[in-house]
Amino acid sequence: MGACCSCLCSRNRDSKYPPLLLAENEREAISALLQYLENRSDVDFFSNGPLRALSTLVYSENIDLQRSAALAFAEITEKDVREVNRDVLEPILILLQSADSEVQRAACGALGNLAVNNENKILIVEMGGLEPLIRQMMSTNIEVQCNAVGCITNLATQDDNKTKIAKSGALIPLAKLAKSKDIRVQRNATGALLNMTHSGENRQELVNAGAVPVLVSLLSNEDADVQYYCTTALSNIAVDEMNRKKLSTTEPKLVSQLVNLMDSPSPRVQCQATLALRNLASDSGYQVEIVRAGGLPHLVQLLTCNHQPLVLAAVACIRNISIHPLNEALIIDAGFLKPLVGLLDFNDSEEIQCHAVSTLRNLAASSERNRLALLAAGAVDKCKELVLKVPLSVQSEISACFAILALADDLKPKLYESHIIDVLIPLTFSENGEVCGNSAAALANLCSRVSSEHKQYIFKNWSEPNEGIYGFLLRFLQSGSATFEHIALWTILQLLESNNTEINSLIKENESILSGIKNLSASQQQTQQSQVNNPDSSDQFDDPKVELFNLTQQILQILG
């Protein structure tokens, strides 16, 4: 508090300054304050006598006393940050109105210190603190700028304040100060802009204020903090589809700059750059552009790093990029399959496992070459090994992957040989609709067009595990769910159309399955009749039960 004490002392010893002409109440305030300062460890400066003494100096017309009060508040609040009331904030806000840069600097600093406390953040804005802070941001004094922006940055961490700040006129000067030559001002300004990107409405205000070109230009800044704030802000801005479209037309260098930052020596900059690319890759144009900009080598390297947040960011990014059909072969050729399969064992993060499986599923969507590469990389075996013991979210992704793979006739022999049916049957018992439905769909596809060469796998799994294919068909026939009944009937029809006498016998000689088919047929017939009797019934031709009835008739016709 030495600086404060010296400001309170007489300047008679310095011939450059005339003696201070003080009012009686000011002399008393100085005397009391000097006494409080001598015993500062036992004094509460935010109430009673100490606060009255400071307030007296604040309201003085003597600029030296105002400076002393501002400096005192700055130093006191640096050491004692807690919730304060209006009586404490009011004199500091008065000091903000001063035309003196020393008073402005110290008052902004004091307010910024108090703005670390959440309740104070709300009260400062409620008491009209934004307007004078915005004025001080536009000061020609760098120190005043720095403290004013720092205070705004702190205030912007409070959710209720963000919209008020966005609409206060603060964003344009913040964007301007983000280009300051003073690194402290830059950091504070970009940090404040980042704090304004956590809601869609505020992000739009930020875009309208012209902050995006500034943020993009600062991606090449040498300071890691500025890079971090800018990449994170842009990542948040890219969450919104409208903003992504605008970025694609106005910021042609954005992707290449973010790709370069994936190689930053700062892990948190790497992470945010990757997340920004992930958000951009929600759009198909960016999915292609990231690959063209050389993003794949960086991403494949990040998948095997030791920093979990980076791994998550990278696998989430490649998952989005893999959605585009043009990227599938390029991703495989870039060496992603092995690390992606390796991430399936990442038990510490369901999210990483989910993104890895989802990427593998995307890569298998459209090409026999890709599907065979997946199989050769051990993806199916690893999924089969894990699927019954992973969390539900991962299980859902794996079952969806199985459903996609089972659609491909070229892959069916390999899937049979991997004994995938051994895990599909238990998965059809899942209480989760997605897991159950995906697994049933995969099983149904594997029962379609069964060749003589592979009929052994149907026989092997007819009654095991868990009552096997037979049990699956019976449960779904009796489920009461039109979707599941449809899967069961379609599977039975596929088995019968394989034209294999032994497979047909499995169904023809099973009274439970035959009974289930006939019961459904009778039920659907009654439904059909009621619709005939009630011609005004809406959507009678779109009723899924019509399709169920048609399936039962096809099956019964084949069975004779």
Swiss-Prot record:
A GO cellular component annotation in the UniProt record: nucleus-vacuole junction
GO MF entry, a single one: identical protein binding
Lipidation (S-palmitoyl cysteine): 4-5, 7
UniProt KW keywords: Lipoprotein, Membrane, Myristate, Palmitate, Repeat, Vacuole
ARM repeats: 39-76, 77-116, 118-157, 159-198, 200-239, 243-282, 284-323, 325-365, 409-448
Function: Functions in both vacuole inheritance and protein targeting from the cytoplasm to vacuole.
Official protein name in the record: Vacuolar protein 8
Gene coding for it: VAC8
